[in-house]
Amino acid sequence: MFLANSLALAALARRALLAAPAGQASRFSSSVFTLGVASGDPSPDGAVLWTRLALDPTAGGAMPPTPIDVQWEVARDERFASIARQGRTAALPEWAHSVHVELDGLEPDRWYWYRFRVNDEHSPVGRTRTLPRAGAPVNQLRFAFASCQQYEMGYFTAYRHMSAEDLSVVFHLGDYIYEGAATAGRVRQHLGPELMTLDDYRNRHAQYRTDPDLQAAHAACPFIVTWDDHEVDNNYAAMSHERGDPIELFERRRAAGYKAYYEHMPLRTRSLPRGASLQLYRRFAYGSLASFFVLDTRQFRTDQPCGDGVRTPCRGAFDEKATLLGLEQERWLSDGFTTSKSRWNVLPQQVMIAPIDRAEGPDERLSMDQWSGYQSARTRLLQLLARRRLGNPVVLTGDVHSNYVNDLKIDFRDPKSPVVATELVGTSITSGGDGIDEPGNLSALLAENPFVKFHNEQRGYVVCEIGPKAMQADYRVLDYVSRPDSPIRTRASFIVEDGRPGAQALKR
């Protein structure tokens, strides 16, 4: 069915391109490239190029209900003196006039520049980078990861700084949009009600995409994206959700959220949504240096066994049938670990693996939406990391609007349990507002959770640099997001050495 849907979409685009009337874009009196450009899902010979045509982005786009002819160019230089590839495609009204160009035939491990054109208007120029050849020696990879960008809670200043970081790729770990209606008194305002329909989700994505700092980050390098919950509904789990609506209503809502997500992300046709389903977990290899296993902990999970919120785990948290990944994704991950020959193996995913205990003393209060609510599934994952003797496993996590560095163990209660991996938890871009450096209960939190090496509650992102001998993580933080001019600084740096699980703080 997926292949048939992909082929049908490609055939529809080809027919629309042939039928598109000449000179159609002369009707447009203002820019159609209001949402910028992006690239993503790189391969050794290509990437996905993205844009969406919209005259009035937050009012459904205001484009005519017809296909639009879009030309694209890929160059070896930023002046477009040496064209590597070029072509035409159709932006279809059925897909909100979004454009997804899947490139091939490019050289591995190099930068390219790209742009789109509708009639006489050129889009902004974007830059993308191909992956190295499979198994090729790679000495360095510099990337960032980010998550949780609630538009109302602050300015996307972090992305302005990120666009100047000289990164090969950015991993976005979810909560790219938030689904709630406008809340009075916040820094910026959502437009429209709580998201329910396809038009709602399209307009919210478009509102976020109009932000110039977010556009700059997307234009600077490719993004590899995955989602968390707010792309559809807070803390949803497969077809379970907090409103309690009939499953048929939520299925339609999830399908709307998934389609709008695809329309606004640089994803390949293999991720083309099929109703309320979308294939998002996938693997990327940077030569022999690093493999990235991008996970989806929302679409296939069972409902939270102990309910939502922070509480003492119930018996259901230890149910072996409870899962965040689903059996098929667990098998895919196990097979990937078995075949990986990379020196570093990185898991970009959504929710915290380490069990952060919020209660002092013998009582235990854990987040039931995180891996702590699915403890048998967490044990399976950590045992898999240990049993496969995977080269240097590192987990990248978002969701919690705070920075952490955690040692991961199969048994967190046993001080003698060996460290099997490192978890780098990145804070939010804006969610939670300005934040603070250290919470008042930091000493108690560290005492209750000795596997935590670092904790901070400012906004920002994490920049990582991987080499054959070590991986370094720099925690980049902003002083505030309630105003758009915050400087950025490195709050802390940690290093994971080759063959030595666990992170060590670097002196600053």
Language model segments and positions:
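Metal-dependent phosphoester/phosphodiester hydrolase catalytic core
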Residues: 2-14, 21-508
